[in-house]
Amino acid sequence: MQEYIDIVTEDNKIIGKALRSECHENPRLIHRAAHILVFNSAGQLLLQKRSMNKDIQPGKWDTSVGGHVGSGESYEKAAYRELEEELGIKNVNLDYLYDYKMRNEIESENIRSYFCKFDGRIDFNKDEIDEIRFWEIVEIKKQLGSGIFTPNFEQEFELYLNMVSHNKE
């Protein structure tokens, strides 16, 4: 099935649409993605290990949930859809965290991130994810820069830490 996603300007205005595959071949085609940081009650962050079959960053630990916003879809609707598709989680509350931009040689994304607290059973999508695990924040900090995480997750994690430390002040 061909997946269309909206193409946007730097300031997130929709200017067209393109196939997902086209967006991954052309970093000038800025598109939207939704991410969710899933925490448990102990304050541990769930990370997913990307399937070795993925075309981008296979086998690396990544944000709890992440996916493209479909053409005509809202960030929030995409976040809930991806949460259910990737982890089998539904009927939870998502809290907005922040927006940020991710740019690299492969693609350009305007990302909206959400927070979710969840302690229930997780039935992850084994076609997209090889493994899931809750991590202590200090453990993630120690591993930053070691090559086990996707560069995008490391960017996201730093943003989250900055937001949390700013809110404590």
Indicate residue ranges for each PLM-predicted region.
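Nudix hydrolase/Nudix homology domain
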Residues: 22, 71, 98, 105-169
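Acidic, metal-coordinating catalytic segment for phosphate/diphosphate chemistry
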Residues: 1-35, 41
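A short, polar/proline- and glycine-enriched secondary-structure boundary/capping micro-motif
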Residues: 26-28, 56-60, 134-136
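Active-site segment of metal-dependent pyrophosphate-handling enzymes
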Residues: 42, 52, 74-76, 84-122
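A glycine-rich, hydrophobic loop/mini-helix early in the fold
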Residues: 33-65
